[in-house]
C-alpha cells in the first residue's frame, strides 16, 4: 500500500477496511507513529447490541419503527462511542427495496441485504493539491441519483448545509448521519455552527431549517466501566421562543455497580409527540 505522506494526518483504508493514520517527524517528536483502527469482520447487528447491554429491546423496537417510518436521524457521541457501529446496526432496519446512497470519508459502513446500494467515498487531494472530492461534492451528486435515503457516515463541516437543507428538507426523508458531540443539545449547536461555515444565513434561519429537517438524535457514550451505551434518545419538536425545542424520550438510568460494572439501562421517559410519519407508515 502507498500513503501520500504528510507530516500530520496521512490516512488510508487497507483491504480489510482497517483505517491507517500516519504522523511523521518532526511533528511526532519521538519518531513516526502509525495507528491502525480495526473493525469487526462481521457486521454488528442490533440484536448483538442488545445482548451487549448497549440498549434494551424496547428502545431497539422504537428505533426500528422510526427508521422504517423514515424519520431523519442523527447519531451523536464522542470519539470511540460506537457511532459508526450503531449507524450500521440501524441501517439493517431500512426496507430492502429502497435505493440507498452512502457517503463517507473512508468506506466503513457495512450495509447488507440492500440490492440497490450506491457507496460513495471522498478523496483527498494529492500532494500537488489536486483531485480532491469532498463529502459536499458527493452529497450534491447523490441528490441527482434519485435516492430514497442518503446516509452520510459523519459530518464535520460545511457539508452539513447540504445534508440538512438539500437532503433532509428536499424529500429524502429517512436520511441519517453521525457527529461528534457530548449530548444531544451540543449536537444541535454543532450542526448550527457547521452550517454557518457553509452558508450565509442568520442563526435564526439556520435553527428553523434544522428544526424542520431533523426528527431524532440518538446519543451514545462510553460510561466509566468503558462499556458503550445508548444514553439518550431526543426528539426535535420544532423552533419556538428563539431556540430549537427538544424532548427526551429515552434516557439511561444507572441503578448501581456490581463487580466494577455499571448496572442500569435506557428507560422510556416520555412519548413521541410527532407521530405523523409513524401513522403514515402504518404503526
Regions found by a protein language model. Give the residues of each.
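Switch/coupling sub-region of P-loop NTPases
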Residues: 60, 65-76, 89-213, 219-221
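Hydrophobic positions on the alpha1 helix immediately C-terminal to the Walker A/P-loop
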Residues: 86
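NTP-binding/hydrolysis catalytic cores, primarily Walker-type P-loop NTPases
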Residues: 226-283
